[in-house]
């Protein structure tokens, strides 16, 4: 059983509200979950403290048990200081494909 900390969408049409939940990765996004850890309201201002609320003790407990945070939840945990998020860096993506091939061939010849 792979356990994930992720967002479950709630709210109405065009007015999203998300619960931060712990769920089995096989469960539907908005369906069954194991435990609710907090909420996220994207409609509030970014500097508003009530925009994101997490029970940090429960989050740390689930991370210690091996739960994997989703990308968005990992950003939240980085902001709150619970878990450092690894930076995604792919410098080759910005280089045009032809130049990438030429650089790879030049490196292979050396």
Swiss-Prot record:
It comes from the Bacteria. Keywords: Ribonucleoprotein, Ribosomal protein. Pfam families: Ribosomal_S16. One of its GO terms (molecular function) is structural constituent of ribosome. One of its GO terms (cellular component) is small ribosomal subunit. Gene3D superfamilies: 3.30.1320.10. Residues 87-110 are annotated as: Disordered. GO terms for biological process: translation. SUPFAM superfamilies: Ribosomal protein S16. InterPro entries: Ribosomal_bS16 (IPR000307), Ribosomal_bS16_dom_sf (IPR023803). PANTHER family: 30S RIBOSOMAL PROTEIN S16, SMALL RIBOSOMAL SUBUNIT PROTEIN BS16M. Belongs to the bacterial ribosomal protein bS16 family. This is Small ribosomal subunit protein bS16. It comes from Rhodopseudomonas palustris (strain HaA2). The gene is rpsP.
């Amino acid at each position: 059983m792979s356990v994930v900390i992720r967002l479950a969408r709630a709210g109405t049409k065009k007015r999203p509200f998300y619960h931060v939940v712990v769920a089995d990765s096989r469960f539907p996004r908005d369906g069954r979950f194991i435990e609710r850890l907090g909420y996220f309201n994207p409609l509030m201002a970014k500097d508003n403290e009530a925009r994101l609320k997490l029970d940090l003790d429960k989050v740390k407990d689930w991370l210690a048990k091996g739960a994997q945070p989703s990308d968005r939840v990992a950003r939240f945990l980085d902001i709150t200081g619970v878990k450092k998020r690894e930076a995604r860096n792919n410098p080759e993506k910005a280089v045009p494909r032809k130049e990438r091939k030429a650089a790879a061939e030049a490196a292979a010849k050396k």
